[in-house]
Design a protein with these regions (language model features):
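The catalytic core of metal-dependent phosphodiesterases that act on cyclic dinucleotides
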Residues: 101, 118-164
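Bacterial c-di-GMP phosphodiesterase EAL domain
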Residues: 2-129, 141
Length: 164
């Protein structure tokens, strides 16, 4: 029971810090280059969410995404990440970088949303980014996800955001 108490207190701590982190805008994106192995040229960037917790420092998604999913905060975080990545893409476009795409991970819960396409299109338009250079990757993050696979499994489905 002491192990269970420890896990429960740790979980409650993460939940509280996660809510506060969203409120205090402690999340940020890192961009990992996607390289064409034939040419060595950077062809895209993958947006990777991180949490800059004031107590724990940089926290990786494996330590907070499942909690965000269970709390129903994942859609909010996913939309924030998509918006931030689209704004960054527009910034790169404004600087003359026009041949690079950006890929953003969304959760199965966000993918199942009825308003997903409308939401993503609105974000792309709001940012003024080229929708043909935005990719969405659907990640399988936990036991209640789209595929019902273990936490280590991942599904990536890339599709350019439509422009209709």
């Amino acid at each position: 029971t002491s192990d269970l108490n420890y896990l429960l207190s740790r979980r409650l701590e993460v939940e509280g810090r996660l809510r506060k982190g969203i409120e205090n805008e402690e999340f940020f994106l890192r961009y990992q280059p996607q390289v064409d192995v034939a040419t060595g040229r950077i062809v895209g960037m993958e947006a990777l969410m991180r949490w800059n917790d004031p107590v724990k420092g940089e926290i990786f998604p494996k330590d907070f995404i499942s909690v965000a999913e269970e709390l129903g905060l994942i859609v909010q975080l996913g939309e924030w990440a998509f918006r931030t990545a689209c704004r960054q893409l527009k910034g790169w476009e404004d600087e003359g970088v026009r041949d690079v795409s950006v890929a953003v991970n969304i959760s199965p819960r966000q993918f199942m949303s009825r308003r997903l396409v409308a939401s993503l299109l609105a974000i792309v338009r709001e940012a003024g980014a080229d929708p043909h250079r935005v990719e969405v990757e659907i990640t399988d993050a936990g036991p209640n996800s789209l595929l019902g696979q273990p936490k280590t499994a991942a599904l990536t489905a890339n599709w350019p955001v439509p422009t209709f």
